[in-house]
């Protein structure tokens, strides 16, 4: 039996559309067990409620990621039980799909005898996810700058330390990335491009130097947040409430609808204010206070292969 623990991520961070991602101390866990039977069993446990959910295998993203690798090596998997312990809300802009893809690929790779190195698995994950800014920080941890040149992936990781607190305000409704991409403009003005690339460089410097006081300017954006936030009632008021109560930076997390804010101290006051602001628009939400993750994917336990040999 082995367990893969993978952190939540906040992609499109501030001005860094499809290029900047941040790893958070909120985790999904995937535990693989060998069965004596030939069955494949997949169960999902919601950490908040303790509820156990069983989805049809074909609808499970981690299963599809596993099968992508098994089919590549012409292996028919049998005798596997997978328990997913889910703490990351689905379709809220926190990288839940990236954890499933990485969990499936790394789990399958272990059961195949580890034919692929981490970097090879990462390239496959980016291909399946279609963009790198969730999967790379989920695997590597930290603050990550990602560049795609054709199918080639380049990235740099910054360790932002553990001082900064993260407050996630998570509305009850879901937004899918595919739908949210449709509201983005096909073209932008030159001045908006300059606005964003200057702040992308500045935000990277802020995380490198741990200059949290400058995050408010560095997190500004004209590429995606103004368009996507139009689908999130109360977004502007939620952002204002966070700043009014001590946040040093606020942005849309991923494609939304989660709003991520940063603070140098405990963030209860910020979280409560954000929830209250959403409430003014009859939207139920909750907040989670957490920290920054610098480790990324972690594997624990006793590996086994489908050939029957355990290591």
UniProtKB/Swiss-Prot annotation:
GO molecular function: ATP binding; homoserine kinase activity
Subcellular localization: Cytoplasm
Top-level taxon: Bacteria
This protein's pathway: Amino-acid biosynthesis; L-threonine biosynthesis; L-threonine from L-aspartate: step 4/5
The keyword Ribonucleoprotein belongs to this UniProt entry's keyword annotation: no
Function text: Catalyzes the ATP-dependent phosphorylation of L-homoserine to L-homoserine phosphate.
Protein name, UniProt field: Homoserine kinase
């Amino acid at each position: 039996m082995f367990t893969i623990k993978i952190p939540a991520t906040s992609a499109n961070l501030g001005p860094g559309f499809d290029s900047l991602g941040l790893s958070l101390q909120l985790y999904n866990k995937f535990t693989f067990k060998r069965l004596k039977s030939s069955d494949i069993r997949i169960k999902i446990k919601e950490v908040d409620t303790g509820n156990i959910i069983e989805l049809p295998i074909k609808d499970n993203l981690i299963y599809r990621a596993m099968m992508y690798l098994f089919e590549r090596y012409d292996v028919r998997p049998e005798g596997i039980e997978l328990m997913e312990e889910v703490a990351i809300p689905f379709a809220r802009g926190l990288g839940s799909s990236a954890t499933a893809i990485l969990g499936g690929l790394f789990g399958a790779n272990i059961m195949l005898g580890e034919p692929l190195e981490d970097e090879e698995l990462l390239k496959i994950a980016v291909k399946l996810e279609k963009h790198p800014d969730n999967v790379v920080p989920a695997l590597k941890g930290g603050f990550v700058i990602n560049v795609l040149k054709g199918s080639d992936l380049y990235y740099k990781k910054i360790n932002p330390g553990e001082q900064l607190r993260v407050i996630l305000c998570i509305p009850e409704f879901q937004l899918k990335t595919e739908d949210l991409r449709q509201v983005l403009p096909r073209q932008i003005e030159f001045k908006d491009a300059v606005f964003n690339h200057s702040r992308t460089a500045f935000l990277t410097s802020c995380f490198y130097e741990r200059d949290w006081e400058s995050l408010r300017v560095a997190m500004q954006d004209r590429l995606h947040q103004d368009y996507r936030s139009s689908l999130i009632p109360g977004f502007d008021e939620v952002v204002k409430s966070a700043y009014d109560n001590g946040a040093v930076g606020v942005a849309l997390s991923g494609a939304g609808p989660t709003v991520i804010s940063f603070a140098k101290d405990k963030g209860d006051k910020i979280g409560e204010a954000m929830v209250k602001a959403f409430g003014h628009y009859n939207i139920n939400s909750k907040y989670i206070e957490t920290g920054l993750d610098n480790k990324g994917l972690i594997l624990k336990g006793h590996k086994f292969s489908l050939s029957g040999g355990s290591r």
